[in-house]
From Swiss-Prot:
SUPFAM superfamilies: Protein kinase-like (PK-like). PROSITE patterns: PROTEIN_KINASE_DOM, PROTEIN_KINASE_ST. InterPro entries: Kinase-like_dom_sf, Prot_kinase_dom, Ser/Thr_kinase_AS. The active site is at 609 (proton acceptor). Residues 202-212 have a biased composition (Basic residues). Residues 1-102, 115-165, 185-241, 344-396 are annotated as: Disordered. It holds the Pfam family Pkinase. This is Probable serine/threonine-protein kinase HAL5-like. Residues 9-19, 66-86 have a biased composition (Basic and acidic residues). Belongs to the protein kinase superfamily. CAMK Ser/Thr protein kinase family. NPR/HAL subfamily. HAL5 sub-subfamily.
Length: 772
């Protein structure tokens, strides 16, 4: 009975449910399409399906009007969905720009190759978020994984036979495009400027970007948002994007195809160094800008020596350089009289050239530090001040090597300084002004160190012979000449002041030789204490030596300040972050080092102590060679041939093997070349090649000798990676020429600079061509 009642009422319930369900679905569809969400091709949503009873399966019967309305709403929803998708992607007209919109966070990962249009990121391309984490990662990221193939080999052989004008930028930058992988750094370096500019302008045709003449990595939709009025910027999804102004501020970073904390490489092949400045400079600025308070607890907790240390000693330091021209000529005349028995001091004074320096006015010291400023004995030459050059009365030998850094003037200065040191003016506690006792009363008063170079603000280094202090002095911005001598920042000149004291067991004669050698050679190489009116005797990679001053207890050498520290600090900072210098960065430093050493060799001086601690840097990456205390003058102005020397000199890891052979003479120029090779390997490897180059005392060096004797190659050199196989091949060949145990087979610095490796190395310092 109960079942019959259910059966009789079931048809009525089904019709009502069907009608309600149809109305519910129609309303749901209307609401769905009005809001623009959902997909027009997918039918009812999950929420609409859940609203209907699951037990009822009677099909819906919509009216004709409902179907027409649904079709119209479907078309509207489809168009709306396409519009939304277009606005989300930020796609402009396909015929104008196929590039897809990329968020700011992924902007630096863009590839400059054809893969950029597909949104794929080449894993071989280095971007700013991928530091050189380790040796293995540096192989994968910095240099790219390259797999050899027959196609690449054949293409290399074909390209090698083609004329160089096909790749004008190739010969200028890297020199070898043969086996370069698409998407790597070397691919970008190989592109000609016309190719890079054309491809960049296709990506961005913005009028503003054309005026800036820059290479855009941004999609067209961002570079010119007003191009397509149908897709305004405000309708785009902004979850992962930023404003155009903020994006333009990151333009320089996005243009770099490689970027680290200290080095960047750009698509046109040039690079930029941005080395950090030592903290003491920033601390000084903060202390000067910070308001002074009457009391501070910080003084109780200082554990290092600060601004006040040794201030009294520096305040009493006086210069050993002559105060004016007259006194200097008078002293040199006395020295000549004593050595040559010439009593015509006044006559000699009239015949001496511009040999002095005005310490107070920073007069030009070029002639004193230049060997080629001395004419021959049978000639007499007047300068602009009316003084004449030396003649036969001086009994000076004829100069045969005008380029030598040690000439007549330098020899006289060495004798003068040596005499003062041997007489014990400073080291025996006599007054500082005793040095000036021979000067006439009309000579101007000498300036103390603090008056001339400012006050000390702290210690920046410490060596075996004393400490190095930093001094600063405010100057007038209208004095441009002084800015060339040393580091200049915020109307302040900074000077490095090196303290020189004899060791407890060091004989005075040895100390005077070391002191005069370091100062006079450095002064002569850097052009002396002058206002840079003539740059004929200056070199960008030689540290400027400015002055030598004295106190009752020590000597102080005033030098140019390099605010970015030395190469040793740069390498250790990279090692702490498990990275090494980029090969292009190391190549640039190597080329600068070789140019500086070449300049020294051309003037008769070998450094003999090349190591990372003696290579300083400016923030722009300019390398400066310093510390000439162990330098060897192998050829003076009166010698036609170079002289060899015996005995080891320098630091053991950088010393050439022939120096350790007892009583064997060696060419100091070839020793410098060996040391330069060690320096380069330390930069790219992050560690020494070996501790000492003596057979039987170092297992690594023994392995090197064994590999070279049996196989003619060393695995360390072969495993080094570069940005291209061509550059890697050129570099490896040069390293084998450097590390020849037999010095007679070793390459010279001049020949190394002419090698394919160095000729294709991009350097941030421009050097004038050497005269033939």
């Amino acid at each position: 009975m109960a079942s019959s009642n259910v059966d009789s009422s079931e048809p009525r319930i089904s019709r009502e449910s069907s009608l309600k369900r149809s109305l519910s679905i129609s309303k749901s569809l209307k609401g769905l399409f009005k809001s623009g969400g959902g997909n027009a091709n997918t039918g009812p949503t999950t929420a609409a399906a859940a609203a209907a009873p699951s037990s009822i399966s009677t099909p819906e019967v919509p009216t004709l009007a409902t179907k027409d309305k649904q079709d119209r709403l479907k078309n509207l929803a489809a168009n709306k969905e396409k519009e939304l998708q277009t606005s989300r992607r930020g796609v402009a007209s396909p015929s104008l720009s196929p590039t897809r919109h990329v968020s700011l966070s992924n902007l630096a990962k863009l590839s400059l190759t054809s893969r950029a249009g597909t949104g794929q990121v080449d894993p071989n391309v280095i971007h700013e978020t991928s530091p050189l984490a380790s040796d293995e990662e540096s192989t994968d990221l910095a240099f790219g994984k390259r797999q050899s193939s027959s196609n690449r080999s054949s293409s290399f052989s074909n390209e090698e036979q083609e004329p160089n004008n096909k790749y004008p930028l190739l010969e200028k930058l890297m020199g070898d495009l043969d086996e370069m992988v698409c998407g790597s750094i070397d691919t970008q370096l190989s592109k000609s400027p016309d190719t890079v500019e054309a491809s960049s302008l296709r990506r961005s045709r913005s009028t503003q970007r054309k005026r800036l003449n820059s290479f855009s990595l941004r999609p067209r939709a961002l570079s010119n948002p007003g191009q397509n009025p149908n897709h305004p910027v405000e309708n785009r999804e902004r979850s992962n994007t930023s404003s155009i102004d903020l994006l333009m501020s990151h333009e320089s970073e996005s243009r770099a195809i490689y970027k680290s904390d200290q080095f960047s490489v750009y698509p046109d092949g040039h690079h930029a160094h941005h080395l950090k400045v030592v903290p003491i400079v920033h601390d000084l600025e903060q202390s000067l800008n910070k308001p002074k308070s009457s009391f501070s607890f910080s003084g109780f907790f200082k554990t290092h020596r600060t601004i006040a240390d040794d201030g009294e000693n520096l305040a009493t330091a006086l210069s050993l350089l002559p105060a004016n021209r007259f006194s200097f000529h008078k002293r040199l005349s006395q020295i000549i009289d004593e050595e040559n028995g010439n009593h015509n001091a006044d006559e000699e004074l009239e015949h001496n050239g511009n040999n002095g320096v005005d310490s107070d006015s920073d007069a030009d010291y070029d002639n004193q530090s230049s060997g080629n400023s001395n004419p021959s004995d049978d000639e007499s030459e007047s300068d602009e001040d009316g003084y004449k050059g030396p003649n036969k009365s001086a009994n000076v030998p004829k100069i045969v090597n005008e380029k030598s850094v040690i000439g007549a003037n330098e020899l006289k200065l060495i004798n003068q300084l040596t005499e003062k040191i041997d007489n014990g003016f400073c080291l025996k506690g006599s007054k500082s002004d005793a040095v000036s006792s021979n000067e006439p009363s009309s000579a101007p008063r000498k300036q103390h160190l603090c008056e001339k170079y400012g006050k000390s603000i702290g210690i920046i280094g410490q060596g075996a012979y004393g400490v190095v202090k930093l001094c600063y002095k405010f100057i007038d911005p209208d004095e441009p000449d002084l800015k060339d001598n040393t580091y200049f920042h915020d109307n302040k000149l900074f000077y490095a002041v090196k303290e020189l004291k004899p060791r407890p067991d060091e004989p005075p004669k040895k100390f005077s030789t070391r002191l005069t050698s370091e100062f006079v050679i450095g002064l002569s190489l850097s052009g002396g204490n002058k206002s840079r009116r003539s740059s004929a005797r200056t070199h960008p990679n030689i540290l400027n030596v400015i002055d030598l001053m004295q106190t009752p207890n020590a000597f102080y050498e005033v030098m140019e300040f390099c605010p970015s520290g030395d190469l040793y600090s740069l390498i250790t900072r990279s090692s702490k972050s498990d990275s090494v210098l980029h090969p292009l960065e190391a190549d640039c430093f190597m080329k600068q080092l070789l140019h500086g050493i070449q300049y020294m060799h051309a003037h008769g001086v070998a450094h003999c102590d090349i190591k990372p601690e003696n290579l300083l840097f400016l923030p722009t990456g300019v390398l400066k060679i310093c510390d000439f205390g162990t330098s060897s003058v192998f050829q003076t102005a009166w010698e036609k041939k170079a002289h060899f020397q015996t005995g080891p000199a320098g630091s053991e890891p950088y010393v050439a093997p022939e120096e350790f052979i007892p009583k064997q003479q060696y060419d100091p120029r070839l020793v410098d070349c060996w040391s330069c090779g060690i320096i380069y390997c330390v930069m790219v490897l992050g560690h020494y090649l070996w501790k000492i180059a003596i057979k039987g005392k170092d297992s690594v060096y023994d392995a090197f000798l064994e590999d070279m004797e049996k196989h003619g190659q060393y695995y360390v050199f072969d495993e080094m990676k570069h940005v291209s196989p061509g550059m890697n091949r050129y570099r490896t060949a040069a390293l084998y020429h450097i590390f020849q145990v037999d010095p007679n087979k070793r390459i010279t610095v001049d020949s190394l600079l002419k090698s394919s490796w160095m000729k294709r190395t991009k350097c941030c310092v421009t050097y004038p061509p050497r005269p033939v």
